[in-house]
Amino acid sequence: MLALKAAYRLVPGDGGEATHRCELLPDDGAGRLLLRDAFEGEANASSVRAESDLAPFKPRCDVLVRATAWAPGEEPAERWTARLRVTGRGAPPPGGDAGGGEPPRRALVDKTLEVCGPRWFERAAEGWQLTRPEPAASVPVRWERAFGGRSLVRAAPGRAPLLDEVCFTNPVGCGWMEARTLDALRDAGAPAPDRVAAPQIERPDSRVTRLAVASHPPHAVEAPQMAEIAADYPFAPAGLGCVGRAWTPRLQRAGTYGEAWVAGRHPFLPDDFSFAYWNAAPDDQQIPHPDVGLRVELWNLARPGLACDGRVAFELPPHRAFAMAWIAGLPVPVPAALDTLSVDAESMVVTCVWRALVARALGVRRMEARFEVDPRAPLLKMAVGRG
């Protein structure tokens, strides 16, 4: 396996559908392969900022967005929407005549998030009441602002917590509570909270209307049971960034590591391992490995001063990454698939990761990473000597 990475700066475009264009950045760090996961805050206890680029294979292309949702015009509002759309070039009409224009584009991702200002679940005699959102000009699109959470009740120093349960679909979010939390707080002699944070990032089909109180078993559960329990959660988290490796449904794709695996497969992957585990994007942000002509559009996901009426749109350049594999003494170009497209709308930087796979049985003695910016150039260029 060979992985290549390139970074582009989004700069204002020259008109047309695209508001911005991609300008290739020099190798100043942004385009270097990431060797370990990077987090927004505490490692393994906050949103993943960017995942390691060392995945062996991704069956689909991850489309990931790191952004802040901005209210239109940067005017504080209680609610607004943000949107991500990714399209590819459509097939030409029969006969090849598109009327002099571009064929209709194919929608690969079209995702809308509902955003609101800070709000809370406040404890009252009749139960937890959801407050009206406070006006806000911006909200970071992080899993901490989406449905999920952790119920942690600490005991005396040096002792195990009285309770430590997480929402299996998003352990770092808010709006979720394990049913034993208030009892555990009372046993610990700790005060119960008067209010808890409510989600600010929602899916249109899963609006959070109440505090989700879930009952987990008092013992540890395996991945299949986690999925069954999570299926009963009343709401689903919403976001645009990496899904944690240990979250449902991604965890279940890692396979089963039981006694049968220890006896028959260890140290290799279990028989039910799915390479889809290596895809980090939410399922609705995974697309087939794209060809040239990919267009990305963002609405209300970039600072208004950098957007055009709240919209940022750009097309990926037709650059090609590939590996030159030397087989039996001859160079053989091996195309690399684009499997990770990351848009950081806060820094206006786009990164792409391509991955090339070559079978070990071919006896490759050497592989070289190559990057071609001329879409018309052949991948293999033969020098002609003059006698």
Question: Where is each model-derived feature located?
Answer:
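Extended intrinsically disordered or low-complexity segments
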Residues: 1-387
